[in-house]
Amino acid sequence: MQKTYIWALVSLLASSLVDARSAVFDQTPLDIGGSDDSFDSIARIDPNNNDLLKSEMDKVIASSELLSLHRALVEIKSISDNEQAVGGFLMDYLYSKNFTVEKQYVDYDDPTGKPIRSNRRFNIYAYPGNSASPGIILTSHIDTVPPFIPYSLSHPESASFKRDDILISGRGTVDDKASVACQVIAAMDHLEKHPDIPIGLLFVVSEEVGGRGMSTFSNSRLNSGTYHTIIFGEPTERALVAGHKGMVSFTIRVHGKPAHSGYPWLGRSAVSEMLPILTEVDRLGDIPVSQGGLPSSEKYGRTTLNIGFMSGGVAANVVAEEAVANVAVRLAAGNPEDAKDIIFRAIRNAATKHRKDATVVISNGLERPKGDIEVIFGLEAYGVVDIDADVDGFNVTTVNYGTDVPHWKIYGDNVKRYLYGPGTIFVAHGKNEALTVGELEAGLEGYKTLVAKAAERERS
């Protein structure tokens, strides 16, 4: 890991003055990539000549500030709760570009919920010179889901080589290091042209595991409330997102009584009691509210539930003493508290229908259970999130996934929030996570447009 970090940093910063940490912004013109005359001959390369193809693809990446930064970020493993290496690299990179950079440590929670200070993860807040309270802020997350997948380049088999078709694969290439790289370069481009309008960069940890990074920033002095525009980065296929669904998560824990499987009536199977409960839970998004279901809306469609994890018992010849299931809910309407009430009633009704004397309780999961069946709601819960999408030239959509948008407490009136980024969510978190050079560079242009629109607001 250390070798990877050093190589990435040296390759990107060899020509930079690393000691210039918080001065007037560098006015040197940027080389951010795009079409280049030196690559006009690439179309004549035989795409089946692997060695030559790899060499030319590497040249394309190395010739572009955007593509080189993206590669360096992706090559550094940064699975949630272990973002220190990529954070250190990004801080040094921003220092070298004459940003002032602040490091904000983000606590962990121990099993009892007590916060623990650690230097393994931290947010990064950067701005030009002394402009610590800019009106425009670009933000993305630097953590990824597991497992780590190395950076690689490929090109589709075709009669000719096309620069835009180079496929960049690896964990984080889309979610969310594409947005991180684009936002950095877009900010540098803006400051080169408009040094009188400061812009901030916020890169947070732990977005993939509950949003603790953004919540920490939101509750700190750095959240000054002087901003008028916040641009969040996520893979949106370069569309502006007009909003996304809300989120509720919960765990069901059933306590049974163990016995020999040859005499099941001497025990009580936790697995057998869990099954009818999950059957009822699984249909809550498909039935109307009048029948005990969860709400839907015209904008976001129906509420969906995913039973993502289930375990129970110890062996086939033992009546199961315990069963556990974890469920994620994507709310299409209503508020989280009402949704929790609906979910709890459904679980209780299913449990008592299966066994009349079943006791169902809401629990924090830490204390000794007071019932046969515990319902443990996660700490993260929010309703639908409406977002601005009023900039011309973009497709507009809604998405079903969660983001850091609801974790940022907004202070002040008329603050615009945009959600945008290159790449598609349909490959994020998958083995095939990837995007093309053309998609990444088009994403940068979209960020430039959003920043320019925000700058107009500041002038007015």
Curated annotation (Swiss-Prot):
List the GO cellular component terms: extracellular region
Q: Where in the cell is it found?
A: Secreted
- The answer to whether keyword Chloroplast applies is no
EC category: hydrolase
Q: Which residues form the signal peptide?
A: 1-22
Q: Which CDD domains does the annotation name?
A: M20_ArgE_DapE-like_fungal
Binding site residues for Zn(2+) 1: 175, 208
Q: Which GO terms describe its biological process?
A: proteolysis
Keywords from the named record: Glycoprotein, Hydrolase, Metal-binding, Protease, Secreted, Signal, Zinc
What the record notes about the co-factor is: Binds 2 Zn(2+) ions per subunit.
Q: Which InterPro entries match?
A: Bact_exopeptidase_dim_dom, Peptidase_M20, Peptidase_M20_dimer, Peptidase_M20A
Q: Give the SUPFAM superfamilies listed for this entry.
A: Bacterial exopeptidase dimerisation domain (SSF55031), Zn-dependent exopeptidases (SSF53187)
Which pairs of positions does the record mark as disulfide bonds? none
Claim: Glycoprotein is one of the keywords in the record? yes
- Tell me its EC number(s), please: 3.4.17.-
State the needed cofactors, names only: Zn(2+)
Q: Which family does it belong to?
A: Belongs to the peptidase M20A family.
Q: What is this protein called?
A: Probable carboxypeptidase ARB_01041
Origin species: Arthroderma benhamiae (strain ATCC MYA-4681 / CBS 112371)
Organism classification: Eukaryota, Fungi, Dikarya, Ascomycota, Pezizomycotina
